[in-house]
Regions:
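Conserved helicase ATPase core of P-loop NTP-dependent helicases/translocases
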Residues: 3-15, 31-33, 174-175, 185-221
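Conserved helix/coil segment N-terminal to the catalytic DExD/H
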Residues: 9-41, 55-60, 222
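Post-DEXD/H (motif II) to motif III coupling segment of the RecA-like Helicase ATP-binding lobe
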Residues: 44, 51-113
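Conserved interdomain linker/interface between the two RecA-like ATPase lobes of SF2 helicase motors
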Residues: 93-164
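Conserved SF2 helicase motif VI
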Residues: 243-250
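Conserved RecA-like ASCE P-loop NTPase motor core of nucleic-acid helicases/translocases
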Residues: 1, 161-169, 190-191
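SF2 helicase motor core recognition
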Residues: 29-31, 106, 216-235
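Structural recognition of the conserved hydrophobic beta-strand(s) that form the central parallel beta-sheet
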Residues: 19-22, 68-75, 216-219
Length: 250
């Protein structure tokens, strides 16, 4: 549409009625100034994943622009670091809905949650900022044949056609993709800076999953937010997290 534009690493539209902007690009000093974007340039500003609004990158945008209306959207307003996003909006919450309510109203797909005990002992592992130590998790997971068998058993039991597995590291994602491929389940690993034997670029992996070329994507922090793959019928949490934000988003 002629009324819609983008402001990101590739496009720099400014003369559109609606602009979809990348936070990483728009938040740079060369764009947040009176010459490029005056503070009152936008009448209406919508910020998705608003729980990030207290971080430096988002805060530069929030503090700079002076729109007539600012709307923040998030499914996970509570942060592990204790920072309060409600302060940014003067505690003005026009609408909120719980996960259960959203499912009951047909806004989200209902799901069955199954917890499977795999005998991994996490009690001695280090935790920093809601994340377990990556190397210690690698040692617990990679090469663990009993865990491989258990994951594969329940994957087969619930007869998934298209699945995503959340892994703790690049090595873990590669290892799981390799293990599933060896068992006859076409799989790919998706992570930043993909360079492994089973690695695929994010959009290409999604395309292959939708087309049935692969059946499982093993990912590391690439599908945590803003993802809608309607054909998915299984999500596998293959690593722990102390962060309720990460858990709910995934």
């Amino acid at each position: 549409s002629e009324d819609y534009g983008f402001f990101d690493g590739k496009e720099k539209d400014r003369d559109k009625s609606v602009i979809f902007a990348s936070v990483a690009t728009l938040g740079r000093p060369e764009y947040l100034n009176e010459t490029y974007f005056p503070a009152d340039y936008f009448d209406y500003v919508i910020i998705d994943e608003f729980h990030h609004a207290v971080t430096d990158q988002y805060r530069r945008i929030v503090d700079y622009f002076q729109p007539q209306f600012l709307l923040g959207l998030t499914a996970t307003p509570e942060r592990m670091d204790g920072k309060n996003i409600y302060e940014i909006c003067d505690y003005n919450v026009p609408y909120q809905i719980s996960l259960k309510e959203a499912i009951n109203k047909g806004m989200l797909v209902p799901f069955h949650y199954y917890g499977v005990y795999d005998e991994t002992d996490y009690s001695g592992l280090r935790i920093a900022k809601g994340r377990y130590d990556e190397q210690e998790l690698n040692q617990a997971y990679i090469g663990n044949e009993r865990r491989y068998d258990l994951i594969y058993k329940y994957y087969r039991k619930y007869r998934s056609a298209r699945a995503i597995g959340f892994c703790c590291s690049r090595q873990h994602a590669e290892d799981m993709a390799k293990e599933f491929c060896q068992r006859g389940i076409a799989s790919a690993a998706v992570y930043s800076g993909e360079n492994g034997a089973y690695a695929e670029e994010r959009n290409e992996a999604i395309r292959k999953l939708k087309n049935g070329e692969i059946r499982v994507i093993f990912s590391v922090d690439m599908f945590n937010e803003g993802v809608d793959i309607a054909s998915l019928d299984m999500v596998m949490f293959l690593r722990p997290t102390e962060s309720p934000v990460v858990f709910l988003q995934q």
